[in-house]
Design a protein with these regions (language model features):
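Alpha-helical transmembrane segments of multi-pass small-molecule/ion transporters
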Residues: 1-223
Length: 223
C-alpha cells in the first residue's frame, strides 16, 4: 500500500502502518459498500442515482471482496506458507502496484478531462480540507495517546491517506464512472500523493524521538 511506502520514507513505524492498513482493509470490505448505500439513500438526489444505476448490495459487497479481500488473502497466505517467496515478491509488487495506481489515476483523469475545471473549482478545496482534517486527527489522536514519534508518523499517514484505487475500481465497476465520479476519486488520489510526499519529505529530515507513553514494535526505519 502507498501509505506504507510513505511511512517508510517518513522514517515512521512501518510495522504499525502495515498493521493499520490490514485492519482497515478488512473492515473496508464490509463498511465501504454499507456506508455508500446507507448515506446515499438519505439524500433524495443520490438515492435516485442509486436506483438509476441499479446498485445491488450483494453485488457491491462482492465487488469490494474481489478487489480487496482476495488479494489480501493471497498475500497473507503467501507470506505465511512461503515466506521466502513473499519476501522476494514484496518489492516488485510494491513497484508494480504504485505504477498501476498512477496509470489508473492518469487514465481516469484523461477520460473525464471535461470535468476537470469543475473539480478544481468546486471539489478540490474540500479534498484538501478533508485531507488536512484527517492529518490533524491522526496526529492529534497519536499525541493524546502519548505515542512515540515513530508511531505518530505512521498513524498520521494512515489516517490521512485513503485507498483511491478501491474508490476508482468501485466507481468504474458499479457506477460506470457516472457524473465524473472517477475524476473525483482520481483527484483525491493525486492530492493524497502530494500531501503524503510532502509529509515524508518534512519528517525524513528530522530524527524521530523515541519518547512517548507507548510504542508499538517497529521495523528498522533506517534501512
Amino acid at each position: 500500500n502507498i501509505s506504507n511506502l510513505i511511512t517508510h520514507m517518513a522514517r515512521g513505524n512501518t510495522a504499525l502502518s502495515i498493521s493499520m492498513t490490514g485492519v482497515s482493509s478488512l473492515l473496508a470490505i464490509v463498511t465501504t459498500p454499507l456506508n455508500i448505500l446507507f448515506w446515499a439513500a438519505l439524500n433524495p438526489d443520490t438515492n435516485a442515482l442509486l436506483r438509476q444505476v441499479s446498485i445491488e448490495p450483494l453485488s457491491f459487497l462482492g465487488s469490494t471482496m474481489a478487489i480487496l479481500g482476495i488479494p489480501m488473502v493471497l498475500g497473507l497466505a503467501t507470506v505465511h506458507y512461503w515466506p521466502r517467496l513473499g519476501h522476494l515478491l514484496r518489492r516488485p509488487l510494491q513497484i508494480m502496484s504504485f505504477l498501476f495506481l498512477v496509470a489508473f489515476i492518469g487514465g481516469a483523469i484523461f477520460t473525464n478531462a471535461r470535468y476537470l475545471t469543475v473539480f478544481v473549482q468546486s471539489i478540490l478545496p474540500f479534498v484538501v480540507l478533508h485531507n488536512a482534517i484527517a492529518i490533524g486527527l491522526g496526529w492529534g489522536t497519536a499525541k493524546v495517546l502519548r505515542l512515540s514519534d515513530y508511531d505518530t508518523r505512521a498513524m498520521t499517514i494512515e489516517v490521512s491517506m485513503h485507498n483511491s484505487g478501491l474508490g476508482l475500481a468501485l466507481i468504474l465497476n458499479q457506477f460506470d464512472g457516472l457524473g465524473g465520479a472517477a475524476l473525483v476519486a482520481a483527484g483525491w488520489g493525486v492530492w493524497h500523493l502530494i500531501s503524503g510526499w510532502a509529509l515524508a519529505a518534512w519528517w525524513k529530515r528530522r530524527d524521530p524521538h523515541p519518547q512517548g507513553g507507548s510504542q508499538v514494535a517497529r521495523t528498522d526505519t533506517a534501512e
